[in-house]
């Protein structure tokens, strides 16, 4: 099980910046150690356990890049219309049977190995075959044209894939090109997910008139699944300090991370912070971020705990910027910083200094046809699920920014990039 050191970070006073909070969490979590071999067809999205070096040069042999005719560069014609006898034919997957004779050509196809002596290929579109079956070649082709040398892509023994990589389809393809059938990956981390609050009912169960159906839990579980986690749905914990403490302690024994939403603010019925202190240690609480200020992080029996706000937009935003990097660190993944795309603001906005804010926006083509501009969603409430559904992403406004004017360059994070 991933462990978190048991020293408490002194919180209070000014709210902590997002970067400070993430840095503190990063120093206190360690990656899961267990490694498992998975079939290569199941490796997409998993975290590579160790480096992979090229066990085979790519390509493993020198081959033709086009359909055409292979010749010796010493025989390249200096004038138009020189005819060469065709003394062989090599298809992809076949081996060259004999060297190319001086003054001869060999019919060759894309991917076929180059015959001994040949080092240049004429594209079939650039030649013609005369009545005698000879190939008539143009002048001016450079030596080595249209040939892929062995190891052109990757040399034998070269570093290919680095440990900690979150494997993508193209990474899986590279491993397959080396002939691998299995890949060693870190085991999936186990995450327990709770919602908290008497005001919540689970979908499919009776809902009282003053209750809402729980949506955060399913959003968070879906986001965790996209990050490759093994997720335990532990339902809804009621607003009872003792029950919360008991549920958190029980989850800590069998999971690598505990994640809750709701109950981390300062209201009389917000018991999560106190429950964490009853069974563990609170490391930090409250961040300078909007939406999402009430975020709690602690340790319970060595297991990291993160408590997110109950408002769905705040929960979404803080998941992206706090939970996501924590999950990657626990999983043994390389850091994957989010890189905002520069766009032009098509809105006016004012904010407090020293607080990072995220504005929900849609993208559209700029009126002058150059680049994209961000259009602010008309409503700002942190409880508006529709504001996440009906927008393309978030504009990130750093701590130093106090206002945004139309035409100003801002950073955009598309939802597709956030997990």
Model-identified regions with their sequence ranges:
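Helix-rich terminal scaffold detector
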Residues: 1-19, 181-308, 312-318, 329
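Short, low-complexity N-terminal leaders and the immediately following helix N-cap/first helix
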Residues: 1-79, 333-358
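Short, glycine/charged-enriched hinge/interface segments at domain edges or termini
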Residues: 2-16, 69-233, 238, 373, ...
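Generic structural signal for well-ordered, non-membrane alpha-helical segments
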Residues: 14, 18-22, 36, 40, ...
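Flexible glycine/proline-rich
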Residues: 19-22, 36-41, 50, 93, ...
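Predominant activation on well-ordered alpha-helical scaffold segments within soluble catalytic domains
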Residues: 22, 26, 67, 124-125, ...
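Structural signal for hydrophobic packing residues in well-ordered secondary-structure cores
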Residues: 26-33, 51, 114, 158-164, ...
């Amino acid at each position: 099980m991933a462990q978190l050191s048991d020293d408490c970070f002194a919180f209070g006073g000014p709210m902590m910046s997002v970067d400070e909070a993430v840095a503190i969490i990063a120093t206190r979590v360690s990656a899961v150690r267990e490694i498992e071999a998975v079939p290569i067809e199941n490796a997409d999205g998993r975290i590579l356990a160790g480096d992979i070096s090229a066990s085979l040069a790519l390509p493993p042999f020198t081959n033709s890049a086009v359909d055409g005719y292979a010749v010796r560069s010493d025989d390249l014609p200096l004038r138009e219309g020189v005819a060469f006898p065709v003394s062989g034919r090599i298809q992809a997957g076949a081996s060259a049977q004999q060297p190319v004779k001086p003054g001869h050509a060999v019919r060759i196809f894309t991917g076929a190995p180059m015959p001994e002596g040949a080092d240049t290929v004429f594209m079939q579109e650039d030649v013609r075959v005369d009545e005698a079956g000879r190939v008539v070649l143009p002048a001016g082709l450079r030596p080595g044209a249209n040939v892929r040398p062995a190891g052109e892509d990757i040399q034998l023994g070269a570093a290919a894939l680095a440990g900690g990589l979150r494997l993508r389809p193209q990474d899986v393809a590279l491993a397959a090109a080396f002939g691998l059938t299995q890949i060693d990956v870190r085991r999936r981390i186990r995450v327990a997910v709770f919602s908290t609050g008497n005001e919540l009912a689970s979908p499919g169960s009776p809902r009282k008139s003053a209750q809402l159906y729980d949506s955060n839990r399913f959003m968070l579980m879906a986001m965790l699944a996209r990050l490759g986690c093994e997720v335990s749905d532990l339902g809804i914990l009621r607003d009872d300090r003792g029950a919360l403490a008991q549920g958190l302690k029980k989850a800590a024994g069998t999971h690598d991370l505990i994640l809750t939403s709701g109950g981390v603010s300062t209201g009389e019925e917000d018991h999560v912070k106190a429950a964490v202190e009853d069974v563990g240690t609170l490391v930090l609480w409250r961040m300078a971020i909007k939406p999402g200020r009430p975020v709690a992080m602690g340790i319970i029996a060595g297991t990291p705990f993160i408590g997110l706000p109950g408002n769905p937009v705040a929960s979404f935003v803080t998941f992206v910027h706090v939970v996501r990097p924590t999950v990657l660190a626990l999983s043994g993944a390389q850091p994957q910083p989010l890189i905002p795309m520069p766009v032009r603001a098509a809105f006016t906005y004012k904010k407090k200094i020293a607080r990072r804010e995220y504005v929900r926006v849609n993208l559209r083509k700029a009126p002058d046809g150059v680049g994209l501009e961000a259009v602010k969603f008309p409503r700002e409430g942190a409880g508006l699920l529709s504001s996440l559904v009906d927008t393309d992403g978030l504009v990130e406004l750093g701590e130093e920014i106090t206002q945004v004017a139309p035409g100003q360059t801002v950073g955009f994070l598309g939802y597709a990039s956030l997990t």
